[in-house]
């Protein structure tokens, strides 16, 4: 079991989504946005940092399982000023997570869309719709919050796939045997996995 916090950074609005992963099952916990309505960039960064810190600390209090964070990588915008502001907002979000001793994984927008929609160039509305379907939500989250949830879903799929690869590699190197296309663990392997 794990808690995954997905972050969609933005200089005016940062979206976040929080899920619980239990094996293949994803359960919605929370989502929302941190709005930075001020014109001053340092104040915006402070609001992003403080908002994500407060939200994460709240969930850290109640979590018995490990917490992982995932954030969308910066894309190269046509406007260099926009790309710099987005990079700064992303930096504030990463700093907030690292200050809480949380590991941060990064994914491109294409990777996130591919994981959620099966198509790396999906529109924002498609991502929003698929997030609702995957998590069986009875409401539609705001787009930036849906993007945060999509980032968390992407991390869940990536980490679950990676865990399977690691387990398969460990079994191949040990006394496990393959029977009818499946790996059979020895008693020693089972003991090492506990």
Curated annotation (Swiss-Prot):
Q: Where is the catalytic site?
A: 8, 72, 144
Annotated keywords: Cytoplasm, DNA damage, DNA recombination, DNA repair, DNA-binding, Endonuclease, Hydrolase, Magnesium, Metal-binding, Nuclease
Pfam family membership, one: RuvC
Relay the cofactor remark from the entry: Binds 2 Mg(2+) ion per subunit.
In its keyword annotation, does this UniProt entry include Metal-binding? yes
> What SUPFAM superfamilies does the database record attribute to this sequence?
Ribonuclease H-like
CDD domains hit by this protein: RuvC (cd16962)
> Which residues of this UniProt protein bind Mg(2+) 1?
8, 144
User: Is the keyword Coiled coil in the record?
Assistant: no
UniProt subcellular location: Cytoplasm
The task this protein performs is described as: The RuvA-RuvB-RuvC complex processes Holliday junction (HJ) DNA during genetic recombination and DNA repair. Endonuclease that resolves HJ intermediates. Cleaves cruciform DNA by making single-stranded nicks across the HJ at symmetrical positions within the homologous arms, yielding a 5'-phosphate and a 3'-hydroxyl group; requires a central core of homology in the junction. The consensus cleavage sequence is 5'-(A/T)TT(C/G)-3'. Cleavage occurs on the 3'-side of the TT dinucleotide at the point of strand exchange.
List the protein's name: Crossover junction endodeoxyribonuclease RuvC
Gene name, Swiss-Prot/TrEMBL: ruvC
